[in-house]
């Protein structure tokens, strides 16, 4: 078995997907432009995806209140200090 995707219910799926594409280099594999605004974003391999969707009727996670060890997305970086600076400047 392989992991195909991880799904997150977020308050603004469209803008979050745009941010991940622009700043993390993820690629949009599939999306819907009407509610629940589902976006499947793939890494360079194209096999692991992050699904962002917006369902106000379902319980959403309080992301700022979640401690990083409980829920996080780990990324590889060739230049971690530079990427941290760049992503923080972009609003991460």
Q: Language-model segments: which ranges?
A:
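Short glycine-enriched loop/turn motifs at secondary-structure junctions
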Residues: 1-2, 65-70
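Short aromatic/hydrophobic contact patches that present stacked aromatics
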Residues: 5-7, 40, 72-74
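Core segments of cupin and vicinal oxygen chelate
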Residues: 8-49
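A short, acidic/glycine-rich surface segment
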Residues: 37, 57-63
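Short, charged/polar surface micro-motifs in flexible loops or helix N-caps
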Residues: 45-49, 56-59, 80-81
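Structural motif
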Residues: 47-50, 70-72
């Amino acid at each position: 078995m392989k992991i195909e995707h991880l799904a997150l219910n977020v308050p603004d799926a469209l803008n979050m997907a745009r941010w991940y594409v622009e700043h993390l280099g993820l690629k949009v594999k599939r999306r819907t432009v009407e509610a629940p605004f589902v976006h499947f974003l793939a890494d360079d391999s194209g096999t692991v995806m992050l699904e962002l969707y917006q369902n106000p009727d379902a319980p959403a996670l309080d992301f700022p209140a979640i401690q990083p060890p409980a829920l996080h997305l780990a990324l590889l970086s060739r230049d971690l200090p530079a990427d941290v600076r760049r992503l923080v400047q972009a609003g991460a």
